[in-house]
């Protein structure tokens, strides 16, 4: 039963429970990322290597999350670790241009045929915010199409229709006139997208989460 599972979980993870209680005193909801809001509490991970993670109580887990999908080579891959250590030895924050950003941009362009130029940002939220602003500036149009449940960050245009408010109404703290310019469509429904585009001449962009 669920109670037996939760009981076994608590028995094996007292360190995570203690840290969770401490976190609730200093972090909103006791977490630093919404995906870690779990009941009765989330695990606290101490180390990781390859496909495995270990919590603060020494329990080992197979990691199917992979750093939100970013760790294609697993945790602590020797070549990645060596490269990071080498880079840290040269400095941590230059506040200036760096040769590797040119090398990196060329690598992205070579890997993605449709890309002509690359703009690096500090987060996915910042990237999608700037992309939508650019699309509106270029087209002179206002609205954009989003797929329900697709995640594109946490700015105001992206909260409606991700985990709730699938009717397009504004989530708490978001202005109604922002939500009204977001058109939500069902994932994988090409006919619905075509219908919206055909019936509304004020569409600046369609945004898609490729892995959604």
Regions found by a protein language model. Name each.
Residues 137-158:
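Conserved PLP-anchoring active-site segment centered on the Schiff-base-forming lysine
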Residues 151-211:
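PLP-dependent aminotransferase-class I/II
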Residues 3, 62-65, 205-211:
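Short beta-strands and strand-loop turn motifs
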Residues 1-47:
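Active-site-adjacent loop/helix segments that line or gate small-molecule/cofactor pockets in enzymes
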Residues 45-46, 109-113, 136-139, 173-178, ...:
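Solvent-exposed alpha-helices and their adjacent loops that cap or buttress functional pockets
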Residues 60-141:
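Glycine-rich loop-to-alpha-helix module at the N-terminal edge of alpha/beta enzyme cores
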Residues 14-22, 52-59, 109-110:
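Short, hydrophobic/aliphatic alpha-helical segments
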Residues 42-63:
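Active-site and channel-lining beta-strand-loop segments
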